[in-house]
Structures are given as structure tokens and as C-alpha cells.
């Protein structure tokens, strides 16, 4: 079934990095915000790498992201998808990242998982390179489907985000 991305990107003029997922899950679409599935470890990973308490409400999560200069969005603005599985995504239409790049000083884009990185490489590479001078960096997915990675291992792999935020 064809789905259109229901959320706006989260960023402000101070955003230094952008984290792109692939496309919102069924649970996220139902609850109206990024990474709303409690099994997804995105928010726990960010809290872990930044040594902060876990944000609970949507407002707290937005404030957390902006306070830490993190922009979030997804690489696809629409796609055909059954359920939440990235493996079942087809007919991908890439997101337009220009509003983020023109409204913030993003120095690095991070792709949350293989599908997000694949979309970045296939459709968004030039836009990302032109804006940041670097290709999107692939991070292991925080999705519960990525059972090969424990929370501790994800935090370790995602420390590059905290390092990028600290530098400069």
C-alpha cells in the first residue's frame, strides 16, 4: 500500500547533524512521531551517547533534539510498504532535504540503518555531498528487527554521532 510521510523534519538553524531513517513504522505513523515504537532503540541510544535522561513526551523529544543540535527526518517521503519492514519498501520517492540544508548548518548526515543508507546513496547522494562535503555515514539500525545489535553495541557504534556533535 502506498504511504506518504506524515511528519515534518525536526531541525532548527543550530542543527549540526542530521539523522535519516528510512520511513516511519506503522507504530510511529499511528502515534504521530518518529521512532514511537517502544521496541525501537533510537531514543535510548541517543540518551546513552549523550549521557542524558530518556525523553518521554513528543515535546521533550523535540526539545532534546534541538538542544543537542540534531535534525531528524527520513530518506523517503513516500513508498509502497507492507507493515514496517524496510525489506518490503518499493517505489521509493526520496525526501527533499533542501529545507534542512538551507535552514541549518549540517556538517554530517547519518543514516539509521541499511535501507536509509541505500536511499541516501541511490537518490540523495549529490544533495548530501553538496550540502556537507561528505557522504552519508551508515549507522546500524536501531530497529527491533536488528536483533544482532544489543543496546550496548548500538551505543558504542553510535558514539560517532556524539563525537561529531562535540567537534567544532
What are these model-derived regions, one by one?
Residues 22, 74, 140:
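Pocket-edge structural micro-motifs
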Residues 1-16, 37-38, 83-98, 121-168:
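C-terminal capping/extension of enzyme domains
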Amino acid at each position: 500500500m502506498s504511504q506518504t510521510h506524515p511528519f515534518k523534519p525536526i531541525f532548527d538553524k543550530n542543527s549540526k547533524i542530521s539523522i535519516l531513517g528510512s520511513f516511519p513504522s506503522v507504530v510511529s505513523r499511528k502515534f504521530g512521531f518518529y521512532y514511537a515504537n517502544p521496541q525501537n532503540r533510537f531514543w535510548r541510544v541517543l540518551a546513552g551517547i549523550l549521557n542524558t535522561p530518556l525523553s518521554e513526551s513528543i515535546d521533550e523529544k523535540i526539545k532534546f533534539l534541538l538542544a543537542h543540535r540534531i535534525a531528524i527526518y527520513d530518506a523517503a517521503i513516500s513508498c509502497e510498504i507492507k507493515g514496517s519492514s524496510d525489506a518490503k519498501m518499493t517505489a521509493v520517492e526520496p525526501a527533499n532535504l533542501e529545507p534542512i540544508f538551507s535552514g541549518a548548518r549540517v556538517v554530517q548526515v547519518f543514516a539509521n540503518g541499511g535501507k536509509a543508507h541505500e536511499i541516501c546513496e541511490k537518490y540523495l547522494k549529490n544533495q548530501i555531498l553538496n550540502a556537507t562535503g561528505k557522504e552519508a555515514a551508515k549507522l546500524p539500525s536501531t530497529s527491533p528487527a536488528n536483533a544482532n545489535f544489543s543496546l550496548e553495541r548500538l551505543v558504542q557504534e553510535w558514539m560517532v554521532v556524539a563525537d561529531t556533535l562535540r567537534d567544532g
